[in-house]
Amino acid sequence: MPYTAPKASVQLHRLTPTGSVVPAKSSPPTDTSRCSAHAVPESVARHHNHAVGPNQCCSTVVQPIAAPVHSVWSVVRRFDNPQAYKHFVKSCHVVVGNGDVGTLREVRVVSGLPAENSTERLEILDDERHVLSFRVIGGEHRLANYRSVTTLHAEPAAAAAGGGTVVVESYVVDVPPGNTREDTRVFVDTIVKCNLKSLARTTENLAAACERLSA
């Protein structure tokens, strides 16, 4: 059955639009927090340490996927094609770069969200350790200074079944005026969870198709 993205309007909470957001001044960091409660290899653990300012929040979402890491990474690493699994993305256009670190993309989102578009910069693309990070640097939205880090890890328990993956995605973002940290965390967590569940469906189907072809 094809995956249908949930209606965004029921998940808005108090994050209502108030107009354009320009690149905001970063809040002075007061703490460096490990947002991930999930155990990750030491080689990538530092990527989930976020400097959290007094008007910011951070969180982590973990998603197991019944597909090998290389299959999941082939989808995640495509900075130019987030709509492959992010169903809140309407379109994406690369404006600078060719997919390497420093690449800029313009993302337009579906109607119903408190946003219209965002400009995002690729900060990390590590094909060896399976790490991708980007930050929002402009656009019309409510998530100023948003920075996301995604890491992929092999799931040893699923090795006998052809391999499995654990995806860990953490982020830090400014709390919009008129909202609380909890408002912001619940809203962004909901979006990230929807994205990662869609990633699981997409890559599990991809892995199954590859397995059928090789049978």
Locate each region found by the language model:
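Beta-strand/loop substructures that line and gate deep hydrophobic ligand-binding cavities in soluble
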Residues: Y3-P6, R135-C194
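Hydrophobic ligand-binding cavity/cleft-lining segments
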Residues: P2-D100
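Short, highly charged C-terminal tails/helix-capping segments
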Residues: L196-A215
